[in-house]
Amino acid sequence: MKLGRAVLGLLLLAPSVVQAVEPISLGLALAGVLTGYIYPRLYCLFAECCGQKRSLSREALQKDLDDNLFGQHLAKKIILNAVFGFINNPKPKKPLTLSLHGWTGTGKNFVSKIIAENIYEGGLNSDYVHLFVATLHFPHASNITLYKDQLQLWIRGNVSACARSIFIFDEMDKMHAGLIDAIKPFLDYYDLVDGVSYQKAMFIFLSNAGAERITDVALDFWRSGKQREDIKLKDIEHALSVSVFNNKNSGFWHSSLIDRNLIDYFVPFLPLEYKHLKMCIRVEMQSRGYEIDEDIVSRVAEEMTFFPKEERVFSDKGCKTVFTKLDYYYDD
């Protein structure tokens, strides 16, 4: 309302001021102020604007990760530092590219949601956040050439409209090999590609590929009596990137994005243990407005299946199905 009254005041004062000075020059100056300064800010009060939450709060992002992502000390640290550093860099050399790997239910999709919500008010529903699902948007191998053209046009058009666009590619392990290489020029160290800068855009890839390698490392630590929190990125990252690159069932199979080192971070999501499932269940109870009932928490967690068969250390579905299982106990 204060801004509205200020604009109205300028409009009411304009006739008398213009009479006292040069009508044309002052009129143009006033118009410039209204259109160049006030209008965009007034518009952004009622509609989402590109980069409207660019003053990303490190504390808010960390709180979202701490409160909602469990058993993923590596992912938390990488995401927090990479995203915060990138958004607060006025002149990045290239787009930020994150490749998130792990079994279903470990938090990959949830992290992409957290990132989107911390940058744009609309989160995944923002006009500046674009989600591609391999099996939905690129189903037919025979249409790869068409998909490549469409993908390039879509990204070019949206980055032209908003430099801070976010592109999320889900089910990379189900994407046809070679397709994702179409976006290679946009991820490289170019100031401009056909007159468009992609350096402030963000690309996030989600995949189950490489999950076996991540599990091997986590299981080795467990069998050695080491804490999972002792796992370092260097223990996994190189082996993970090689595994994904050589996986014929992955959209990254022999991809130039990996070969040219254009993926900034391969982010491993560790398989979840029994205690992490209980954390997920408690958060879901709270989100539904229920008091935490530890008996129900334990019963739901115990209904989940675990692997390896002998040791039963890790949940084979992560936290993905605990929410639906919780419905059984609250059928009112």
From Swiss-Prot:
Domain of life of the native organism: Eukaryota
Subcellular localization(s) per the UniProt record: Endoplasmic reticulum lumen; Nucleus membrane; Cell projection, Growth cone; Cytoplasmic vesicle membrane
Glycosylation sites: 143, 158
Main location: endoplasmic reticulum
Binding site for ATP: 102-109
EC assignment: 3.6.4.-
Keywords: ATP-binding, Cell projection, Chaperone, Cytoplasm, Cytoplasmic vesicle, Cytoskeleton, Disease variant, Dystonia, Endoplasmic reticulum, Glycoprotein, Hydrolase, Membrane, Nucleotide-binding, Nucleus, Signal, Synapse
Keyword Hydrolase appears in the UniProt entry: yes
GO cellular component annotations of the record: cytoplasmic vesicle membrane; cytoskeleton; cytosol; endoplasmic reticulum; endoplasmic reticulum lumen; endoplasmic reticulum membrane; extracellular exosome; growth cone
Protein task: Protein with chaperone functions important for the control of protein folding, processing, stability and localization as well as for the reduction of misfolded protein aggregates. Involved in the regulation of synaptic vesicle recycling, controls STON2 protein stability in collaboration with the COP9 signalosome complex (CSN). In the nucleus, may link the cytoskeleton with the nuclear envelope, this mechanism seems to be crucial for the control of nuclear polarity, cell movement and, specifically in neurons, nuclear envelope integrity.
Disease entry from the Swiss-Prot or TrEMBL record: Dystonia 1, torsion, autosomal dominant: A primary torsion dystonia, and the most common and severe form. Dystonia is defined by the presence of sustained involuntary muscle contractions, often leading to abnormal postures. Dystonia type 1 is characterized by involuntary, repetitive, sustained muscle contractions or postures involving one or more sites of the body, in the absence of other neurological symptoms. Arthrogryposis multiplex congenita 5: A form of arthrogryposis multiplex congenita, a developmental condition characterized by multiple joint contractures resulting from reduced or absent fetal movements. AMC5 is an autosomal recessive form characterized by severe congenital contractures, developmental delay, strabismus and tremor.
Protein name: Torsin-1A
